């Protein structure tokens, strides 16, 4: 018996889950269909829990090896799902970071506005909301890397370096913990709001107001006074 809680294909280009429909009509080819379905299921079932069989089936692929043919492994599929959004976000952020780095008077708030605006813009599309809901699932390793001062993506490294410079008066262990707080707050709050929108409940704030709210609370957390005693560090 089919699990009624699981998504089901109802047409070639449509997948229904409860009252919501995943539209695949805009996907130009098999690879894009697999990416969109994977993104959708990863957001709801987890990047490690979503079943490859379900991704193939909901993407309309009878060949059980279709996903493996296009991506090779689950890890590569996860990377492809993230990069389809992240590369566009990086392209929006990089020229703004170029301008910021020419200034001597930038603040943490200035940096956060560059980070937050393109992320929050993803709330306006189903695919973007799924992307935001996936980010916290892969953040465990990133938070560990930040504590060690490690970043991988060039744009992320630039952002972290700029934020770190704004926190220069704080001891290094505290600065690194503040950067973890930044990453956890921005990812979890965006993911939570994306899920809230997907629930169908009317939004409390529109995208612009939510972006301003994020910048307010995260800049306050980053720049909060340090009262940790030296003996505790």
Features from the language model and the residues they span:
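Basic, helix-initiating cap at the start of DNA-binding domains
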Residues: 2-45, 54, 58, 76, ...
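An amphipathic alpha-helix adjacent to DNA-recognition modules
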Residues: 31-36, 71-94, 98
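Helix-turn-helix
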Residues: 47-76, 80
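Hydrophobic alpha-helical connector segments
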Residues: 94-129
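Helix-loop "lid/cap" segments that line or gate small-molecule binding pockets
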Residues: 114-125, 134-143, 165
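Amphipathic C-terminal alpha-helical segment
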Residues: 121, 137-147, 175, 179-202, ...
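Amphipathic alpha-helical packing segments from all-alpha helical-bundle domains
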Residues: 129-132, 143-167, 177
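All-alpha amphipathic helical-bundle segments outside canonical DNA-binding/catalytic cores
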Residues: 167-183, 206-209
């Amino acid at each position: 018996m089919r699990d009624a809680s699981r998504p089901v294909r109802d047409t070639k280009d449509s997948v229904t889950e409860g009252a919501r429909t995943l539209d695949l009509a805009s996907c130009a080819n098999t690879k894009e269909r697999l990416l969109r379905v994977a993104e959708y299921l990863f957001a709801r079932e987890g990047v490690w829990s979503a079943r490859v069989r379900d991704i193939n089936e909901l993407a309309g692929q009878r060949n059980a090896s279709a996903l493996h043919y296009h991506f090779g492994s689950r890890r590569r599929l996860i990377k492809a799902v993230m990069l389809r959004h992240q590369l566009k976000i990086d392209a929006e952020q990089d020229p703004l970071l170029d301008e910021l780095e020419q200034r001597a008077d930038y603040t943490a708030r200035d940096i956060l506005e560059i980070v937050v605006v393109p992320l929050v813009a993803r709330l306006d599309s189903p695919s973007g909301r799924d992307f935001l809901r996936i980010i916290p699932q892969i953040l465990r390793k990133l938070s560990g890397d930040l504590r060690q001062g490690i970043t991988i993506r060039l744009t992320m490294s630039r952002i972290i370096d700029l934020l770190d410079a704004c926190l220069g008066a704080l001891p290094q262990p505290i600065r690194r913990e503040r950067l973890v707080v930044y990453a956890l707050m921005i990812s979890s709050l965006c993911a939570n709001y994306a899920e809230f929108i997907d629930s169908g409940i009317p939004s409390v704030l529109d995208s612009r107001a939510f972006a301003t709210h994020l910048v307010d609370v995260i800049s306050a957390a980053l720049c909060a006074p340090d009262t940790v005693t030296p003996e505790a560090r």
